[in-house]
A protein has these predicted regions:
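Signature aromatic-anchored transmembrane alpha helix within multi-pass, membrane-resident enzymes
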Residues: 210, 323-344
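Alpha-helical transmembrane segments and terminal signal-anchor/GPI-anchor hydrophobic tails
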Residues: 41, 46-50, 55-64, 84, ...
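Transmembrane-helix motifs of polytopic, lipid-linked glycan transferases
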Residues: 109-126
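Short hydrophobic/aromatic helix or loop-helix immediately within or flanking a transmembrane segment
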Residues: 46, 50-54, 64-100
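Membrane-embedded helix bundles of polyisoprenyl
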Residues: 132-150, 154-161, 188
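Start-transfer (signal-anchor) and selected internal transmembrane alpha helices
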Residues: 1-31
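Membrane-interface transmembrane helices that cradle and orient dolichyl/undecaprenyl
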Residues: 160-173
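Transmembrane-helix signature of polytopic, membrane-embedded enzymes
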Residues: 22-26, 123-140
């Protein structure tokens, strides 16, 4: 846990040592290095890394039909081979680079760079240069630490986050291009084309209040909807069958508080809502998805991340409203983010199946490249 706490304070200290215009670069570099050199950190790390060691897979094509896939799998059954065949095309490109250079750790570095690069570019566009935004990104359970596990999806999420500039500037072709690229990292991103059209709805705050209340009573309708063979979603039905653990339940209550907090602040300051309308709507819609789909395994939480990430665009304005209305000091926000981090690490350390974060380990300190985070019970 010490390493994670060290990084938290390092983000603060180094950001304060330099002028504000360097904040995004500093935080990007710190989190990139911390992510890129990790070993066996992240729930799915072992799967990603194991595939990256299969240098002989370089011979396989990026584009392969379903029948060819089944034929190859029948000839040589390997879990990693199946994963390669079914993953999205741009992920295969990254793996081929790693295999060509015979560097398994490179794939971790490439994913880490892409995720944080597009987050940084999005913040640069909006001229958001506050280290507290990065602290929130680092400490909030659904963001940075999830990106250490679901790397493919988080590249897609970060690209969608970056595409917000094209929504604001009404550049639909560039937005569509971003969605297409994101979808080639994770197919669920194709569904995010809806963001562009939501921006034209001009939703009132009352609609967000309505969504908050019905999110607790949508189970029956959504259950029938998810059981249909909907485009893209049908590929991820397995997540509907996967139960949410203790950590997911804690995040559930955090999301409720987050949604309520955004609504309250929106009513306290009309200018706040008007200036950040699209980002607020997307974030609240993400909260709605998380709350409404909490009983359906991991599908809801994972889809909600595409939307909730937009909170980074108005986090500093939220702080300004709270300072103005309630005279809350800056250190209170930092304390809350620190407590979120401690809570996250505590839950992870005591996970009933396997810790994904604790302890932190760098790849150059693990000479034999052995996975140490063993399963405590049947996963």
């Amino acid at each position: 846990m010490v390493m994670y706490i060290f990084i938290f304070f390092l983000l603060i200290i180094l950001s304060k040592l330099f002028t504000k215009k360097y904040t995004n670069n500093i935080c990007f570099i710190i989190l990139f290095i911390f992510s890129a050199i990790r070993f066996d950190v992240g729930w799915d790390f072992q799967v990603y890394y194991s595939l990256a060691t299969k240098f002989d897979y370089l011979k396989y094509s990026i584009f392969i039909t379903k029948s060819e896939t089944l034929l190859k799998i029948n000839q040589v059954w390997e879990k990693e081979l199946w994963l390669y065949f079914v993953m999205e095309p741009l992920n295969k490109v990254l793996y081929k680079v790693g295999w060509f250079l015979k560097s398994p750790q490179l794939i971790i570095g490439l994913y880490s760079f892409l995720i944080l690069f597009f987050i940084k570019k999005g913040l640069d566009y909006k001229k958001k240069k506050d280290y507290e935004i990065w602290l929130f990104f680092y400490s909030f359970p659904l963001f940075y630490f999830h990106s250490l596990s679901t790397m493919r999806q988080w590249v897609a999420i970060s690209i969608i986050f970056f595409s917000y500039k094209y929504i604001e500037n009404k550049k639909i072709l560039k937005f569509i291009l971003c969605v297409l690229i994101a979808g080639l990292f994770h197919y669920t991103a194709f569904l995010l084309g809806i963001l562009y059209f939501i921006s034209y709805l001009n939703l009132k705050k009352e609609v967000l209040v309505f969504l908050f209340f019905i999110s607790f009573f949508s189970k029956g309708f959504l259950e029938k909807l998810l059981l249909l063979d909907l485009p893209v979603i049908y590929k991820y039905k397995v997540y509907i069958l996967t139960s949410i653990g203790k950590g997911g339940k804690i995040i559930f209550f955090l999301i409720i508080l987050l949604y309520l907090g955004i609504l309250i602040i929106s009513y306290l300051d009309k200018k706040f809502y008007e200036q950040n309308k699209n980002a607020i709507i997307y974030t609240c819609f993400g909260c709605f998805i998380y709350i409404a789909l909490i009983d359906f395994g991991h599908l809801g939480p994972r889809m909600s991340e595409y939307f909730i990430i937009f909170i980074l665009y108005f986090l500093d304005d939220t702080e300004k409203v709270l300072k103005k209305k309630f005279k809350i000091k800056k250190y209170i926000f930092i304390l809350i983010e620190f407590l979120l981090l401690i809570l996250l690490l505590h839950v992870d350390k005591n996970h009933i199946v396997r810790s994904q974060l604790v302890p932190y380990e760098a790849f150059f300190l693990n000479k034999d490249k052995t996975f140490h985070k063993i399963i405590k019970q049947g996963e």
